[in-house]
């Protein structure tokens, strides 16, 4: 790997990471893998390296992923019509078969393979395995009316025992975001990966939830680039939620859910930047937006970087 850093600068980078390596040793961190990091080959490899790094320094990474772009691509290739209502994919039984196939048979397998190129570490499983997730079918309010969007649900229950077993065995769990219907375990629902990651982080008692996005973080006053938030208390974030763009809102709602569920910190970071996870976790300034219990907000423009 090419770097322009001299020996002294390399040493400074390592020393800066030392207190964070000590603080997070033995802790569980749930990472929601998504956005451009899932479709760019170089970023995929960087993500896999980050997961291996975390594991090798004594941290327990757990990955939860979706696969919206890959699902859309496969539906199109198979000639299956797919529509969205209120920003949510209408998931017919035919489309659900494709969702399961892509998430568990393609996205998961690829990521497991990239991680396992560094050693026999990753194990893929879905929300169906060992009843990891259970979900209730969702009928969102769209244009003031409850709307049927098919086999789409919200995670309402987590049995994390299978994931805990993998962590204790030194593995890196890679979890696909599908879940059996709580009312009919033979029916499988498509669930939002952000909220699934938050639910799993809470159930595991994780120290952190990290969500990869295609933006730098949360902006308090979008599109003002100087309003990028470095740290925000969950109470202030709650007040901001109604004002957020539709794409960012579910991610920030997941952060709120995680903090409310006992997770100490939740992060929104830019997955388009190589190794952004390591930069957020192991540097003092970080690179994205961190959500914590309590109140208050700091903009990154106020940091002495």
Curated annotation (Swiss-Prot):
Under the heading CDD domains, the entry gives: AAK_NAGK-C
Question: Could you say which EC number(s) this protein's record lists?
Answer: 2.7.2.8
Name the major location.
cytoplasm
Sorted alphabetically, the Gene Ontology BP terms of this entry are: arginine biosynthetic process via ornithine; L-arginine biosynthetic process
Q: In which pathway does it act?
A: Amino-acid biosynthesis; L-arginine biosynthesis; N(2)-acetyl-L-ornithine from L-glutamate: step 2/4
Q: Which GO terms describe its cellular component?
A: cytoplasm
Species source reads Bifidobacterium animalis subsp. lactis (strain AD011)
In its UniProt entry, what is this protein called? Acetylglutamate kinase
Q: Which reaction does it catalyse?
A: N-acetyl-L-glutamate + ATP = N-acetyl-L-glutamyl 5-phosphate + ADP
Which residues bind substrate per the record? 67-68, 89, 190
What does the UniProt record say this protein does?
Catalyzes the ATP-dependent phosphorylation of N-acetyl-L-glutamate.
Name the gene behind this protein.
Answer: argB
Q: Which Gene Ontology MF annotations are present?
A: acetylglutamate kinase activity; ATP binding
Taxonomic classification: Bacteria, Bacillati, Actinomycetota, Actinomycetes, Bifidobacteriales
InterPro entries given for it? AceGlu_kinase-like_sf (IPR036393), AcgluKinase_fam (IPR004662), ArgB (IPR037528), Asp/Glu/Uridylate_kinase (IPR001048), Glu/AcGlu_kinase (IPR001057), NAGK-C (IPR041727)
């Amino acid at each position: 790997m090419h770097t322009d850093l001299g020996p002294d600068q390399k040493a400074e980078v390592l020393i800066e990471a030392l207190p964070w390596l000590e603080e997070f040793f033995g802790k569980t961190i749930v990472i929601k893998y998504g956005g451009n990091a899932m479709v760019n080959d170089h970023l995929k490899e960087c993500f896999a390296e980050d997961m291996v790094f975390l594991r090798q320094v004594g941290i327990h990474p757990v990955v939860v992923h979706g696969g919206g772009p890959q699902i859309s691509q496969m539906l199109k290739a198979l000639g299956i019509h797919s529509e969205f209502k209120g920003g949510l994919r209408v998931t017919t039984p035919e489309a659900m078969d494709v969702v399961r196939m892509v998430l568990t048979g393609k996205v998961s397998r690829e990521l497991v393979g990239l991680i396992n190129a560094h050693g026999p570490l990753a194990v893929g499983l879905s929300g169906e395995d060992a009843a990891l997730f259970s979900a209730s079918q969702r009928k969102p309010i769209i244009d003031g009316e409850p709307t049927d969007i098919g086999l789409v649900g919200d995670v309402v229950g987590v049995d994390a025992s299978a994931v805990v077993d993998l962590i204790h065995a030194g593995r890196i769990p890679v979890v696909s975001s599908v879940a059996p219907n709580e009312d009919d375990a033979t029916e499988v629902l498509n669930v939002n990966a952000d909220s699934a990651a938050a639910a799993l982080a809470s159930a595991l008692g994780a120290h952190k939830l990290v969500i990869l996005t295609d933006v730098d973080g949360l902006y308090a006053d979008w599109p003002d680039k100087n309003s990028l938030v470095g740290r925000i208390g969950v109470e202030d974030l709650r007040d901001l939620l109604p004002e957020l763009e539709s794409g960012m809102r579910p991610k920030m709602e997941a952060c709120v859910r995680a903090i409310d569920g006992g997770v100490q910190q939740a992060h929104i970071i830019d997955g388009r930047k190589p190794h952004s996870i390591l930069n957020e976790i192991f540097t003092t300034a970080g690179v994205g937006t961190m959500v914590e219990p309590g109140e208050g907000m700091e903009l990154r423009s106020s940091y002495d970087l």
